[in-house]
């Protein structure tokens, strides 16, 4: 039975600032051009859910703070503050300010919350650090913060909030892994971090990449703008994914050759994009944009160091009119997603992206009608689950908490299944936000995945 939100009480302790356990350099470090792609105050919070440790003598808050302090010796920029430079760009002042850490105690057991597997957004938001609004335009949140909440069963959650201008998802995961390794007794992290942001600084170009969509042609929804936005987590099991892929291959004509099949990401991305557009009832002649993050660390020449933890993503983009998206065979849309992803991996595209962002950052702020753009992020392969064991047990779940950058309509995240639901092994969880009036239609589209005929 779901826990009653009104009954959930969380007692907060005083915020402390965890500093590196050893002296670290006091310098100001510049960020890369790609680091500046997100807004400087964009924070992405996630909640890691742990069952009660087998050794009940260990205090998870003490262990985490000790490990964090050790990890900050290697990741010392994360103990600093973001500052605006005279040229308008953001840098990180490595001033040893420390990482905000908040300890809390909940009045219930994790099982009463179903280990957040139902993903009640109101609960998830209480389990991450609440950043206060910036006081002026030159002040930004801390690069990272933690909130550890203990539950009556002995289990706990770790809410980690990271500034997207300092780390992308891969980088944040490596930082978390370093903390875990040190908490479990290692003397140093296996993967040593490197800064090297100069590798991704662009040049001014007179031929920037064109904006993929403009306000005049963007599709609009009668349901947007909306004040009543819902967040839902949909479970797509392994069998539904298999049937979807088989149906896509059947759509392809016998005369058409496919050197490789469709990936789970490509298949679900196209399906979710179309389902969302239908749910929003976008106008037929308007254009809709699917934009998704593409990890390019290994596609640079030479590849970035494994220890690089800054933003290293470009974006795949597909633009169709609503009529095309609604009426084309789904396999055609999946092919467009695959092609766009492959282009985003190329050295030429990576360079053009960086140079365009350096020359004209506004080009990446897509002008759109309400609901025209779906921004999709794939977290399945970041590595947050399951190999993040603090020496007790693996995490049972990991979920996003929609604060700040997540708190707008138009975002979708693909997640790995939780360890709480064995039936979802090999499946995908789809986290999405929509106006309340549009959610029933989207649910109908997602339910249809279960009855697709291969």
From Swiss-Prot:
A Gene Ontology biological process term: alkaloid biosynthetic process
Catalytic activity: tetrahydroanabasine + acetyl-CoA = ammodendrine + CoA
Annotated Gene3D superfamilies: Chloramphenicol acetyltransferase-like domain (3.30.559.10)
Enzyme category, top tier: transferase
Enzyme Commission code: 2.3.1.-
Top-level division of the source organism's lineage: Eukaryota
Database matches in Pfam families: Transferase
Any one GO molecular-function label of the UniProt entry: acetyltransferase activity
Keyword terms, alphabetized: Acyltransferase, Alkaloid metabolism, Transferase
Subunit architecture: Monomer.
Family: Belongs to the plant acyltransferase family.
Role according to the record: Tetrahydroanabasine acetyltransferase involved in the accumulation of quinolizidine type antinutritional alkaloids (QAs) natural products. QAs impart a bitter taste to plants, acting as repellents and toxicants for herbivores and predators, and possess a variety of pharmacological effects, including sedative, anticonvulsant, anti-inflammatory, antiviral, antitumor, antipyretic, anti-hepatitis B, antifibrotic, antiallergic, antidiarrheal, analgesic and antimicrobial activities. Mediates the conversion of tetrahydroanabasine into ammodendrine.
PANTHER family found in the cross-reference section: ACYL TRANSFERASE 4, HXXXD-TYPE ACYL-TRANSFERASE FAMILY PROTEIN
Protein name in UniProt: Tetrahydroanabasine acetyltransferase
Species classification: Eukaryota, Viridiplantae, Streptophyta, Embryophyta, Tracheophyta
């Amino acid at each position: 039975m779901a826990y009653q939100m009104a009954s959930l009480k969380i007692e907060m302790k005083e915020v402390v600032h965890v500093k590196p356990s050893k002296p670290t350099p006091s310098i100001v470090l510049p960020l890369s051009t790609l680091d500046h792609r997100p807004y400087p105050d964009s924070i992405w919070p996630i909640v890691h859910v742990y069952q009660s440790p087998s050794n009940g003598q260990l205090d998870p808050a003490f262990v985490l703070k000790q490990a964090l302090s050790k990890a900050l010796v290697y990741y010392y920029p994360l103990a600093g503050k973001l500052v605006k430079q005279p040229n308008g760009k953001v840098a990180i002042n490595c001033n040893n300010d420390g990482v905000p850490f908040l300890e809390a105690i909940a009045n219930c057991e994790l099982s009463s919350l179903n280990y957040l597997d139902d993903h009640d957004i109101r609960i998830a938001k209480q389990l991450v650090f609440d950043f206060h609004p910036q006081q002026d335009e030159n002040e930004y949140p801390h690069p990272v913060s933690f909130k550890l909440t203990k539950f009556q069963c002995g289990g706990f959650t770790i809410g980690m909030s990271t500034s997207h201008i300092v780390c992308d998802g891969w980088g944040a995961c490596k930082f978390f892994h370093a903390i875990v390794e040190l908490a479990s007794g290692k003397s140093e992290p296996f993967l040593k971090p490197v800064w090297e942001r100069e590798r991704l600084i662009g040049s001014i170009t007179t031929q920037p990449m064109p904006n993929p969509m403009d306000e005049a042609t963007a599709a609009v929804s009668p349901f947007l703008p909306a004040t009543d936005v819902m967040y839902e987590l949909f479970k797509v099991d392994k069998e539904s994914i298999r049937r979807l892929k088989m149906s896509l291959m059947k759509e392809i004509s016998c005369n058409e050759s496919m050197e490789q099949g469709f990936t789970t990401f490509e298949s679900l991305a196209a399906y979710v994009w179309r389902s969302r557009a239908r749910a929003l009832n976008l106008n037929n002649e308007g254009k809709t944009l699917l934009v998704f993050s593409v990890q390019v660390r290994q596609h640079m020449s030479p590849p970035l160091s494994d220890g690089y933890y800054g933003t290293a993503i470009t974006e795949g983009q597909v633009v169709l009119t609503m009529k095309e998206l609604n009426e084309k065979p789904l396999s055609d849309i999946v092919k467009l997603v695959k092609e766009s992803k492959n282009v985003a991996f190329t050295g030429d595209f990576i360079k053009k992206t960086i140079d365009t962002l350096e020359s004209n950052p506004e080009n990446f702020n897509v002008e759109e009608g309400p609901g025209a753009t779906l921004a999709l992020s794939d977290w399945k392969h970041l590595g947050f689950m399951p190999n993040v064991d603090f020496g007790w047990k693996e995490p049972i779940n990991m979920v996003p908490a929609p604060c700040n950058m997540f708190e707008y309509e138009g975002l979708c995240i693909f997640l790995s299944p939780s360890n709480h639901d064995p039936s979802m092994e090999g499946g995908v969880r789809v986290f999405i936000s929509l106006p309340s009036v549009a959610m029933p239609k989207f649910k109908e589209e997602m339910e249809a995945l279960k009855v697709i005929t291969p």
